[in-house]
Amino acid sequence: MSKFLHLLRQLDSSQIITLGFLTVILFGAVILSLPICSADFTFTPFVDSLFTATSAVCITGLTAVSTAYHWNILGKLIILMLIQIGGIGFMSIVTMLFIAVGKKITLKERIVIQESFNLSQRHGLVSFTIYIFKFSFVVELIGAFFLSLRFIPQYGFVRGIFYGIFHSVSAFCNAGFDLLGKTDHLYPSLTSYVGNPLVNLTIMGLIVIGGIGFLTWDDIYTKKYHFRQYCMQSKVILLTSLFLIFVPAAFFFFRDFAGMPVKERTLCALFQSVTTRTAGFNTADLSGMTGASQAIMIVLMMIGGAPGSTAGGMKITTFA
């Protein structure tokens, strides 16, 4: 045991972050493979549970089995926890646990936190981590409230609230997991809500808020609406995000979804533009889109979101 602890102390910050995520993924995969997590209370093949856990922690949204029908409530809660850990970061969770038990954050731990969020300085790291938790909780709570307004009438009170929470967290963390499977189509995502403004705007808002990044929102909160005072990174992220949302959306509007009414067509074009950059939801059959639109979506997927955000990709700042 002492040798193992000594080995851990020798790891650098990037190795600690990598090992932490691998540990979370493997732990989640083992739990998901157990009968207590499946709807029919049978063992899930480990490769399927490992794929699901990896996809959740890495906020990818790809699934090997139906999230709606294969997993029971415990399995869905495990997936939700993995998404949250992947979205706000492994080191954020560890830091908050240290704060909760009164443990002092060491210099090495501060360096790990700094690297996990791509921060340029170590000053105020603990307060920044607390800010991330508070910000995430408030945004996800608001998103869950609005989504529940639609889900409760459709699924009942308890299930509607759970669906609201699950999809709010999944959208904010840019994960793309959903619980809306149908018996005739196991992976419909949000296609049944293509014309629903409440669901579309809420999901899009959560994706954008999560994808812009915690540093950008901290800059906005500190300097309010004085755009000229924002740091260069925040300006680049905000302006480029607007470009990457509305220009592809306009292209999708005129090239795809021709049979839809104007309202649905507008929502659908905007939604596909927003969600493509790592979120993974969809409100339309993407296989029916034109080749040019699919090529644009591939580029958007590659770009992703902002540094220090819940989104993946090569990052907006790299693209800009």
Give, region by region, the residue ranges found by the protein language model.
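Membrane-proximal intracellular helices of multi-pass ion channels
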Residues: 1-320
